UniProtKB/Swiss-Prot annotation:
Its main location: cytoplasm. The gene is DRE2. [4Fe-4S] cluster binds at C311, C314, C322, C325. This is Fe-S cluster assembly protein DRE2. Residues 186-241 are annotated as: Linker. The C-terminal domain binds 2 Fe-S clusters but is otherwise mostly in an intrinsically disordered conformation. The N-terminal domain has structural similarity with S-adenosyl-L-methionine-dependent methyltransferases, but does not bind S-adenosyl-L-methionine. It is required for correct assembly of the 2 Fe-S clusters. A motif (Cx2C motif 1) lies at residues 311-314. It comes from Lachancea thermotolerans (strain ATCC 56472 / CBS 6340 / NRRL Y-8284). Monomer. Interacts with TAH18. Interacts with MIA40. Belongs to the anamorsin family.
Length: 348
């Protein structure tokens, strides 16, 4: 069983349409020394429908119609094929596109030779034995009995820790009550008499300046108070309002409109003004509007010898008249016939 060489032929699904290609590959020199050949579709292996045994095959061949640079192969199957190959097993059919995956999974890439490009799994076939120097035996005592090794008893002394000293109690910080600003100023003045004299001189100068300023503004205020002018005198008579507001005699308030129960005469004055305005309107608008015969007659002179309506359809009736025709509501008439508008004079 150990001398039997098993091979695996993985077939691309597109190759099933050309069975003669599969037979020609089986008869090639690659499978010449194979005693057993297994044949599976690569998609069956990809979907785990077929499980491969570990280290069973010495040769795996992938048959695909694709070009070498366009091969599409599931990268996860490279590890599966590496596990199913024996040490020194060969894998044909893949290209340098998957070279990195081959190196990761323990393959060596072979580019030269009669068999062409293929991968070889690293294993016992390529390992070489190396001599190893053994440790010389120890001389035993004359008695020939082996003595047990003697081990010194370790000492597990616990580490000693020194008790930390307690910190000495410290009292609470004491705070000195601050002195009043006045007292500190007095103390400083007592200590430094020259500085006090300088400050007194500055204070006296500032007091004199303040007194002079107040005197100046008092003089200005006195002049303004002596020459004050009434604000009403600054308004010209022409700028005064021409509206006279009548004060109601009962409520003693200024009103533009008379009260409901006014007895001061404002209500009567307003009524008199309203009557005068109404009478003026009646005089202007009360005159009746009268039209002469020429104004009441609309004649079209576009057709000589024949008189028709102004719009050309006025004589046909309301169905044919425009919305602004003055003959709306009148019966139809003959073109050129004078029409009197006396019937609608009241509406005008």
């Amino acid at each position: 069983m150990s001398g039997e060489k098993s091979s695996l032929l993985l077939i691309h699904p597109a190759v099933t349409t050309t069975p003669e290609l599969v037979e020609s590959v089986k008869k090639s020199n690659v499978f010449a020394d194979s005693s057993k050949l297994d044949q599976f579709l690569v998609n069956k292996l990809n979907d785990s429908s077929v499980q491969l045994e570990d280290e069973k095959y010495s040769l795996v061949y992938y048959l695909t119609p694709e070009k070498e640079s366009e091969i599409q192969f599931p990268t996860k199957l490279i590890a599966v094929l590496a596990q199913s190959l024996r040490g020194g097993g060969r894998l044909f059919g893949l290209s340098d596109v998957y070279k990195i995956d081959a190196l990761i999974n323990g393959f060596e890439v072979v580019n030269s030779g009669e068999q062409g490009y293929h991968w070889v799994k690293k294993g016992t076939a390529h390992t070489q034995t190396a001599p190893v120097a053994l440790r010389p035996k120890r001389n035993t005592p004359s008695g020939g009995s082996k003595s047990l090794p003697i081990f010194a008893k370790p000492s597990f002394a616990l580490p000693a820790f020194k008790k930390a000293e307690k910190p000495k109690p410290t009292g609470l910080p004491t705070f000195k009550k601050p002195e009043s600003p006045r007292a500190s100023v007095v103390a400083e003045d007592l200590d430094d008499g020259d500085e006090l004299d300088g400050m007194n001189e500055d204070d006296s100068n500032s007091d004199e300046l303040t007194a002079s300023k107040s005197k100046f503004f008092d003089d200005v205020a006195g002049q303004d108070s002596a020459d004050s002018i009434d604000e009403d005198d600054l308004v010209d008579d022409a700028e005064k309002s021409a509206i006279t507001v009548v004060t109601c005699g009962k409520t003693k308030t200024r009103r533009r409109k008379a009260c409901k129960d006014c007895t001061c005469g404002l209500k009567e004055a307003e009524a008199q003004e309203a009557d005068a305005a109404r009478a003026a309107q009646d005089r202007i608008l009360g005159k009746p509007v009268k039209f002469d015969e020429q104004e009441l007659t609309e004649i079209d002179f576009t057709i000589q010898g024949k008189k028709v309506g102004g719009c050309g359809s006025c004589s046909l009736g309301d169905a044919f008249r425009c919305s602004g025709c003055p003959y709306l509501g009148l019966p139809a008439f003959k073109p050129g016939q004078p029409i009197s508008l006396d019937t609608i004079a009241d509406d005008l």
